[in-house]
Amino acid sequence: MAARDDAGARKAQHDAEIHDLRSQVSMLEEEVSVLRRKLAESPRQIRVLEDRLHETQAKLAAVTGQNERLVATLKEAREQIIALKEEVDRLAQPPSGFGVFLGAREDGTVDIFTGGRKLRVNVSPSVDVSQLKQGQEVLLNEALNVVEALGYETQGEVVMLKELFDDGERALVIAHADEERVIKLAEPLRGVPLRAGDSLMLEPRSGYAYEKIHKAEVEELVLEEVPDITYEEIGGLGPQIEQIRDAVELPYLHADLFREHKLRPPKGVLLYGPPGCGKTLIAKAVANSLAKQVAEKTGQEGKSFFLNIKGPELLNKYVGETERHIRLVFQRAREKASAGTPVIVFFDEMDSIFRTRGSGVSSDVENTIVPQLLSEIDGVEGLENVIVIGASNREDMIDPAILRPGRLDVKIKIERPDAEAAKDIFSKYLVPGLPLHPDDLAEHGGSEEATIEAMIQRVVERMYAETEENRFLEVTYANGDKEVLYFKDFNSGAMIQNIVDRAKKMAIKQYLETGQKGLRVSHLLAACVDEFSENEDLPNTTNPDDWARISGKKGERIVYIRTLVSGKAGSEAGRSIDTVANTGQYL
């Protein structure tokens, strides 16, 4: 009984185990089935995961680039913030002042000038005090201490140097309205050669002069080397040349004889006469001749200076400027003359500036200009090497005090050329070597000299003939007398030169048109006619007497002028001078 019970129990246990095993087999089969399904699905999931990996990597790269851009933007923003902060800090700083360095002290402080005050201040360690120069600009902080060295002032007033003191650091200058002031020379002017009359740039607040100014009107008065003009180049003025040589060259070249005879050399010479007759040429030739005479006398290279001053360029609208220019002219002349060099001061158009005092219409500037010249001429007395030469075609308008003996002692009239003088002038322009027409040469045996001489003779006879075709003007004097004036009465060296130039131009045009080369007497005669015809309308002033005086006609006052020439096409003879409309130069 008991055995049956045990067997039944073992069987039941065995059945339970079999059931469990079957359950496990079933579960394993299901698990195997699941695994098989998963195994079948694995490649697809791998592909999905790979796609997701690639997508994630792309997103990561984009995020990385964006992050780098953000980093750069943040860095740039940080730099901008720093720069803005610096700008804000800089703008918030108090203003820096400027001062002028005056000098250094032994205790390390320096003296400066700023804001109209002289101050003694400290210096930043970054500034080398030993390198600071008087007059130099310095930068100041809020406490007015020097923190930086700068350059020199470049703006200021222009003043004229009157005297340089012995210490070489100070000078006496003349400002506007002839105000005198003592100033100091800044470092850039130390050692620069300065002389009275120089223009300086002054900073008026600090009292330092920084620069030498080359003013244009002063440069125009600088002494010029003498042009290469000789007496031989001047025609028709032999007697006048001899007079001026006696007045100028003899006293300079033979000063010992003049001292022995107790003869005072003339201080000046006045050359007067009609326009275009050689006054300026003579003055230049005098300087050139002096240089050559000095070279012959001393055996060394001769040198002289010619200071050509045109009257109108001296005039200045500011009071006192014209007088300053006159002082400057004579001061420069004295400087050159003190070296033993002859200096000629030549005033051209002297009547335009040194008129008779009281004759002015509006400003009467001559009331101060004339006395200035008189004092300068009188000051030349002690200088042997300065000669004053004046030129004018209206000597009657020059102040009598200038013309009196002791100032412009010698007065030389430059006359209009007569026939012989005209031949001499023509010979200066018609010289051997010019191309002459073969026909004209053949008439005189092929001789250039004979041909030119004959040409000159023909054209001079044409110019100086008192014929109907040479009648120019009929003048009526105040007493009622009338006189006919011919072109020869208004001839000049300048007109002769113009005639020769016209003839040469005609010869050139003929050669270009016909191929026939050379100057002919017909060219000279035609040029003479053209020159006369052009002069028909020139006497155009409404005051006949003034025009006559400028043209060299003196004597009875002229009240009426009538033209007699009818050289131009369309012009009529016998017109009153008041009806002439065209303008032109004086004859």
UniProtKB/Swiss-Prot annotation:
Keyword hit for Ligase: no
Any one cellular-component term (Gene Ontology): proteasome complex
Ranges for region Docks into pockets in the proteasome alpha-ring: 586-587
One MF term in the entry's GO annotations: ATP hydrolysis activity
Pathway: Protein degradation; proteasomal Pup-dependent pathway
Keyword hit for Lipid metabolism: no
Pfam families linked: AAA, Prot_ATP_ID_OB_C, Prot_ATP_ID_OB_N
Domain of life where this protein originates: Bacteria
Coiled-coil regions listed in the entry: 9-94
Keywords in alphabetical order: ATP-binding, Chaperone, Coiled coil, Nucleotide-binding, Proteasome
Binding site for ATP: 276-281
Listed SMART domains: AAA (SM00382)
SUPFAM superfamilies xref list: P-loop containing nucleoside triphosphate hydrolases
Gene Ontology biological process: modification-dependent protein catabolic process; proteasomal protein catabolic process
Comment, domains: Consists of three main regions, an N-terminal coiled-coil domain that binds to protein Pup and functions as a docking station, an interdomain involved in ARC hexamerization, and a C-terminal ATPase domain of the AAA type.
Function statement: ATPase which is responsible for recognizing, binding, unfolding and translocation of pupylated proteins into the bacterial 20S proteasome core particle. May be essential for opening the gate of the 20S proteasome via an interaction with its C-terminus, thereby allowing substrate entry and access to the site of proteolysis. Thus, the C-termini of the proteasomal ATPase may function like a 'key in a lock' to induce gate opening and therefore regulate proteolysis.
Family that this chain belongs to: Belongs to the AAA ATPase family.
Subunit organization: Homohexamer. Assembles into a hexameric ring structure that caps the 20S proteasome core. Strongly interacts with the prokaryotic ubiquitin-like protein Pup through a hydrophobic interface; the interacting region of ARC lies in its N-terminal coiled-coil domain. There is one Pup binding site per ARC hexamer ring. Upon ATP-binding, the C-terminus of ARC interacts with the alpha-rings of the proteasome core, possibly by binding to the intersubunit pockets.
Identification of the protein by name: Proteasome-associated ATPase
Record gene name: arc
